[in-house]
Amino acid sequence: KPKEDKEWVKFKAKHITSQSVADFNCNKTMNDPDFTPDGQCKPVNTFIHSNTGPVKDICRRASGRVNKSSTQQFPLTTCNKPIRCKYSQSNTTNFICITCRDNYPVHFVKIGKC
């Protein structure tokens, strides 16, 4: 079994959550020490409420480094504009555009089609 791409491992940790939209809490997640290793609060981050399978499938048959749009919509939560690390939270359901590298998602480009 080939070793998982390091960037994919980081992508999963940063952008994929098994929590439901209703249970998800931006402040709790974004201020987790694992999420802010340097102690700085990130200005914005989008989370995909999904198992890893459907997200990884977006990059099936993607060779090299390429941006791809999902064919299905995902429930998404965006945490943004922290004031002293307190985030506002917005939810939507939409397609996503991600950067794939050799069949693995490695970067979240934007909400919506590429």
Swiss-Prot record:
Q: Where in the cell is it found?
A: Secreted
Give the EC number.
3.1.27.-
Its PTM note reads: There are at least five different forms arising from glycan heterogeneity.
The active site consists of H15 (proton acceptor), H107 (proton donor)
Q: Which CDD domains match?
A: RNase_A_canonical
Disulfide links within the chain:
C26-C79, C41-C85, C59-C100, C97-C114
Q: Name one GO biological process term.
A: defense response to Gram-positive bacterium
Primary enzyme class: hydrolase
Q: Subunit details for this protein? A: Monomer.
> What is this protein's record name?
Amphinase-4
Which species does the entry assign this protein to? Lithobates pipiens
Q: What is the lineage of its organism?
A: Eukaryota, Metazoa, Chordata, Craniata, Vertebrata
